[in-house]
Design a protein with these regions (language model features):
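Outer-membrane beta-barrel translocator/receptor signature
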Residues: 91-94, 104-185, 191-197, 248, ...
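Acidic/polar loop-and-plug regions of large Gram-negative outer-membrane beta-barrel proteins
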Residues: 169-173, 186-257, 261, 270-310, ...
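Structural signature of Gram-negative outer-membrane beta-barrels, strongest in the C-terminal barrel
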Residues: 190, 310-312, 329-341, 348, ...
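Acidic, small-polar-rich N-terminal luminal/periplasmic segments of exported/outer-membrane proteins
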Residues: 1-129, 485
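Gram-negative outer-membrane beta-barrel transporters
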Residues: 404-407, 504, 525-627, 696-698
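Face-selective signature of the C-terminal outer-membrane beta-barrel domain
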Residues: 250-273, 301-425
Length: 699
């Protein structure tokens, strides 16, 4: 009820009375999950959020209401892009706020565009009583993890603080041939004076994996003919398949309360990240080809090295305050944001020659994969395959007007967004801009009841185009539009939220060409006809529309010893005159979007054993279509986790906490769905039954 969340442009606000849907995960909530990645921790309880990657795959991010948000698009302390590409670290996470829905006007436009959600991480700071905790954990199959959390405050009013966190994990996962080596370090130093608050953060994370990336590609082209999900221990690629992710972030943020009823905040941060290793794209066979004798097999494809670099500079400066015009209150805010991201991708000099065709029905995939050899060259091309810079500048204004003793609140505002994209490889630069408006309202007929609604937009950069005269232009950013209405009610020991939303996102032509510049899918494709009329790749065409209803409830029952939660989302994802990945117009449903997702959890502080807490979590994912015409769908599945936590105190400060859990108790075999651009459908094998045990000692 009293969760204070960071809403970027709107400042810190009460999550219960906010005019948008926002969920806060505090440090204890994240730590108690003991998920190996941040996305797995966040996605396990909210029905409108679905993880992709995480522990199951080295490609990492979240889906909000059916749309994708990559890990590199997460914000840290309000600074965009500071989490790092394919990041999984959580050692520095003090809290995480999920803002659901289109949010460009509130949070600013990501350099590469994002739709339907934002995630902001607040870093850990030293508590008033200090932080002193060490931990040791074991995760199946044979991973050992050590953690340390040391923090202290100094000064007469404890105005100075430092906090350091570390996590090391190494060993074999439950999946055959899949092992990881994870290192995470975080340092925070902060000053909190009467008016000025300043914080410095430094975060380093490196994750090395073997056998950790095995994603089945382009299932939509195989008419959905994918074999049944195997046991989660099964690896679709050999153990020599490897990827490393490394990232370093440094940032400085501040808040200053002036003598004139307004506050100034700002920050600057720099993140450098790298993702490198082998790139292999296993593909299901549609029918008999030179590579496959029948359908329902898959070919591993060949292996090639990839080396991807990301450099992001992020800064912001904002001011907010309050004044009155008669009986009407005004909470105003203004913000300037600037983000510069540089991307470069290098490839190996060539792909390997070895490949293998796998017959899943024969079993013993490891034996079949033995024919697939790591014969790829270990040399990299001297020139980048992708070399680009994206600059995003924006200026935002908003005013929240309070009427009727602030029980009726109307927020109006917008953000002017300027984008500059430079393709260094092609020596092309394009610029564009757009204004993204927002309108929000919240009505509080009583302190425990809130009706709210909003209209917001998300922006994504458009493509650069060069005409026959050599003039380079860039279309205005693509606009996705959201309408949302909801109601929250505090019943005392139970809080409920019901909301309905619609998000409409434009499609755009792929216009794929081969090395000779010819259209990949021939002159009979719908794009070929469009191009003949003067159209071009990247032009907007058709739309995808997600309409849904969410219901969430959580409570504190039995004298706050029983903590249940439940969430349900029903969503339709429709395509209308939407360009497919094969440059054909389609009408139908979007792939990899379960229509129904439900999640429930419970924690019980037992009365018969002081310090003992039992917990359970259930996740249900409805069937999801893997082609737009609904000819094939992955079946629904349910995951069940159970766990326990016991804390024994020794004196005033010392305490030992032992916790453990079994995830995927019934060892459910399932495909974890993922989406690519257009109507591309991907999937990875879900993780098998997993055990873990952890001991933390606080002193």
């Amino acid at each position: 009820m009293l969760d204070r969340v960071n809403l970027s442009l709107l400042g810190r606000a009460n999550a219960f009375t906010a005019p948008i849907t926002v969920v806060n995960y505090d440090e204890n909530r994240i730590n108690n999950k003991q998920a190996r990645t941040l996305v797995d921790a966040v996605a396990s309880t909210d029905a409108s959020v679905m993880a992709f990657g995480g522990e199951s795959n080295t490609l990492t991010g979240l889906y909000f209401r059916g749309f994708q948000l990559d890990a590199r698009q997460f914000s840290v302390n309000g600074l965009a892009g500071m989490y790092g590409t394919q990041g999984t670290a959580d050692v520095h996470v003090g809290s995480a706020q999920l803002i659901k829905g289109a949010s460009t006007a509130v949070t600013g436009m990501d350099p590469e565009g994002a739709v339907s959600g934002a995630l902001n991480i607040e870093t850990k700071k030293a508590s008033d009583d200090g932080n002193r905790k060490v931990g040791l954990a074991w995760f199946s199959d044979s991973r050992v993890q050590t953690t340390a959390d040391i923090g202290q405050r100094f000064g007469e009013s404890k105005q100075f603080g430092i906090r350091a966190n570390a996590k090391l994990r190494h060993g074999d996962t439950p999946r055959d041939g899949y092992k990881e080596d994870d290192k995470e370090f975080a340092f925070n130093a902060d000053y909190r004076g009467e008016k000025l608050r300043v914080a410095f953060d430094s975060v380093y994370a490196k994750r090395k994996t073997h056998g950790g990336r095995a994603r089945m590609q382009d299932i939509q082209n195989a008419a959905g003919k994918l074999f049944a999900a195997p046991d989660g221990k099964t690896n679709l690629l050999p153990a020599w398949n490897w990827q490393n992710t490394v990232g370093q972030t440094n940032m400085l943020t501040f808040e200053y309360d002036t003598d004139h009823s307004f506050q100034i905040t700002g920050g600057i941060g720099y993140n450098k990240a790298r993702y490198y290793g082998t790139l292999i794209s296993p593909t299901i066979c549609r029918n008999a080809t030179t590579a496959c004798t029948t359908a329902n097999q898959y070919t591993t494809g060949t292996a090639r090295l990839t080396d991807q670099y990301f450099r992001t500079l992020s800064m912001n400066l904002s001011a907010r305050g309050e004044f009155y015009t008669g009986p009407v209150s005004h909470n105003w805010s203004t913000a300037f944001d600037r983000i510069i991201r540089q991307r470069a991708t290098y490839r190996g000099t060539a792909a390997g020659r070895s490949t293998a065709t796998i017959y899943p029905e024969r079993g013993n995939l490891a034996g079949q994969l033995a024919a697939f050899k790591p014969d790829y060259p270990n040399r990299m091309e001297s020139n980048a395959n992708l070399d680009a810079r994206i600059k995003v500048n924006s200026l935002a204004l908003s005013d929240t007007l309070g009427f009727l003793d602030n029980t009726l609140r109307l927020t109006v505002g917008g953000r002017f967004q300027h984008v500059e994209y430079t393709d260094k490889k092609a020596n092309e630069t394009g610029k564009s801009h757009r204004i993204s408006p927002m309108l929000m309202a919240a009505w509080l007929p009583s302190p425990d009841l809130v009706f709210y609604g909003n209209y917001m937009q998300d922006l994504e950069p458009a493509d650069i185009k060069t005409d026959d005269d050599g003039n380079t232009t860039m279309a205005k950013p693509r606009v996705s539009r959201q309408f949302e209405f909801g109601v929250r009610k505090n019943w005392g020991d139970v809080v409920t939220t019901l909301s309905a939303f619609q998000i409409k996102r434009p499609g755009y032509w792929r216009g794929q060409t081969n090395a000779n510049g010819r259209l990949t899918y021939g002159n009979n494709s719908d794009f070929a006809k469009y191009k003949a009329q003067g159209g071009a790749a990247g032009d907007e065409q058709g739309f995808e529309r997600n309409r849904g209803v969410e219901f969430n409830v959580y409570g504190n029952l039995m004298n706050k010893t029983l903590h249940p939660s439940f969430g349900l989302m029903y969503m339709r994802s429709d395509l209308r005159k939407y360009p497919s990945s094969r440059d054909m117009l389609i009408n139908g449903v979007q792939v990899a979007s379960p229509r129904v997702i439900a999640k429930a959890g419970i924690e019980w502080d037992t009365p018969f054993a002081q310090g003992l807490t039992l917990n359970a979590n259930v996740q249900y994912y409805g069937k999801s279509y893997q082609d737009s015409q609904k000819k094939y769908a992955f079946p629904s599945y349910t995951l069940v986790d159970i766990g326990a936590r016991y804390t024994k105190k020794f004196g005033e400060r010392n305490a030992l906490t032992v916790s453990g859990a079994v995830e995927n108790v019934f060892n459910k075999h399932y495909w974890q769905v993922q989406r690519g651009q257009y109507d591309r459908s991907f999937a990875v094998v879900g993780m098998p039954r997993t055990f873990w045990l952890k001991a933390d000692y606080s002193f």
